């Protein structure tokens, strides 16, 4: 789920990470605050600075949503396997949740390139293969993008044996983005219409192998984001009580739908709506959801790990059995001691 939505994740290693990505992903994960170690935030429009300490800066997410919020019933049909492009997967989920037809992200195609010492073939939008030429002293790849309107740009880059990519705005260096082994969506910053965004990275000139590149650059449609945020926030779950294993809140649903929860779906969650037990669903095979009807409802969640009751009964039974065996053993020992003392007394009598 996280990997297909553009977050760094390794299914083989069972490793899942958070990296600053898009405001919509932060909505889905319930992120309210961000801490930036370098103090640099490429897109300040989506966050608000709240504190600074040396080089560390904390930000408040302007598009934060509560732990639960009302989404359309079509969200239950969402599948992460419909597309390999993380932006289009987000577009699909956003449309199902909100019913808004306009896409949240729009693809920005390559304006031109400035490669050096590398032969590159394009295999479709975002997909390339390259072959470094041994004669080049410092081979590198360079892609330029130019949005047609003021926007926030985001990129998804997957390339082997590259640790970071340099980002330029109108030929001016802005920052370097570290690339993890697990690729993910990252922000490029805010751009005016006609401004040039450049991604440039060096290629290992010792390599004689073909390399594969996946590079998507998309523009965020901020009006669509704002419309969707206002809609989802209006159906937010108002939390009234919570603990490590319990959560209670009130949801005002203006239509039949699903209460999406930024909580991983597990069998251990038990949910009641207005005091009645209800079945949960898994959204995208990962997140918890609860079908609700229109109206005002009290939703209560309680977590008890699957197998806890059976495990407790087995453990209790084992303790009782051990206690019973211990008591029997002690009685037998006392009986043996009594018999031994009696025999010694008879032996000692005149």
Please give the residue ranges for each predicted region.
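Hydrophobic beta-strand segments of well-ordered beta-sheets in folded domains
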Residues: 32-33, 84-87, 98, 102-103, ...
């Amino acid at each position: 789920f996280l990997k297909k939505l553009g977050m760094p994740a390794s299914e083989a290693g069972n490793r899942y990470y958070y990296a600053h990505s898009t405001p919509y992903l932060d909505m889905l994960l319930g992120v309210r605050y961000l801490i930036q170690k370098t103090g640099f935030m490429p897109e300040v429009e989506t966050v608000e600075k709240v504190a600074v300490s040396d080089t560390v800066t904390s930000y408040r997410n302007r598009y934060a949503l509560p732990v639960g919020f009302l989404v359309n019933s079509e969200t239950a049909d969402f599948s992460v396997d419909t597309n390999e492009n993380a932006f289009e997967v987000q577009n699909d989920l956003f449309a199902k949740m909100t019913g808004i037809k306009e896409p949240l992200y729009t693809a920005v195609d390559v304006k031109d390139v400035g490669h050096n010492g590398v032969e590159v073939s394009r295999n479709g939008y975002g997909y390339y293969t390259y072959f470094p030429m041994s004669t080049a002293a410092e081979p590198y790849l360079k892609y330029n993008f130019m949005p047609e309107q003021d926007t926030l740009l985001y990129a998804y880059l997957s390339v082997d044996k590259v640790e970071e990519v340099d980002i330029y705005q109108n030929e001016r260096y802005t920052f370097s983005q570290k690339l993890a082994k697990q690729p993910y969506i990252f922000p490029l910053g805010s751009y005016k219409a006609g401004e040039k965004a450049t991604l440039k990275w060096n290629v290992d000139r010792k390599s004689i192998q073909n390399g594969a590149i996946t590079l998507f650059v998309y523009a965020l449609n901020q009006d669509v984001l704002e419309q969707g945020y206002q809609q989802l926030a209006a159906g937010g779950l108002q939390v009234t009580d919570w603990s490590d294993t319990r959560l209670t809140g009130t949801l005002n649903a203006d239509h039949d739908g699903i209460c999406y929860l930024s909580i991983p779906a597990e069998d251990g969650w038990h949910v009641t709506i207005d005091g009645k037990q209800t079945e949960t669903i898994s959204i995208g095979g990962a997140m918890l959801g609860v079908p609700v009807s229109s109206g005002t409802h009290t939703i209560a969640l309680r977590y008890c790990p699957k197998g806890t009751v059976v495990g407790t009964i087995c453990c209790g039974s084992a303790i009782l059995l051990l206690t019973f065996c211990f008591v029997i053993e002690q009685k037998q020992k006392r009986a043996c001691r009594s018999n031994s003392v009696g025999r010694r007394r008879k032996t000692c009598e005149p």
